[in-house]
From Swiss-Prot:
Its main location: cytoplasm. It catalyses: (R)-4'-phosphopantetheine + ATP + H(+) = 3'-dephospho-CoA + diphosphate. This is Phosphopantetheine adenylyltransferase. One of its GO terms (molecular function) is pantetheine-phosphate adenylyltransferase activity. It comes from Dehalococcoides mccartyi (strain ATCC BAA-2100 / JCM 16839 / KCTC 5957 / BAV1). Pathway: Cofactor biosynthesis; coenzyme A biosynthesis; CoA from (R)-pantothenate: step 4/5. It comes from the Bacteria. One of its GO terms (cellular component) is cytoplasm. The record marks 16 as: Transition state stabilizer.
Amino acid sequence: MIAIYPGRFDPVTLGHLSVARRASGFCDRLIIAVFDNPAKPGLFTAAERVDFIKQSIKDLPNVEVRSFSGLMVNFARKMGASLIIRGLRVGADFEREMEMYVMNRRLDEGIELCCLFSEPQYQYLSASLIKEIVILGGDSSGLISEHVAVALKNKLASV
């Protein structure tokens, strides 16, 4: 089975990577799909985000990382995927994922959704919270990979 794990990953957190590692255990092939939205650019380019994830998942042979734009169901179809993986942290995530599930099913009934609960230590972790912590001089260790932490500090210093 081919699965897609889509997201902005701006930047990728250890919570994101935890979901990817767990999902890779029950998929033949997992594609981490980095959403590239030119209308809403992130702090890091799609290419940078793809590279950060690739550096973090080198030990997972059945996982690849690609960027995409447009509708995620179209990308999933193009990749031959029949399953979308999403991580759930708190209740608000469930509501958002349910909305997306209903719309994606309307667009393509052949693509299913699998939600994985975040591990407890990552339930309140988000990429925007990480950026705020680093901007305010806080310690991001244990929240993002070291190579991402270095890149984030450098990027924020130049903004």
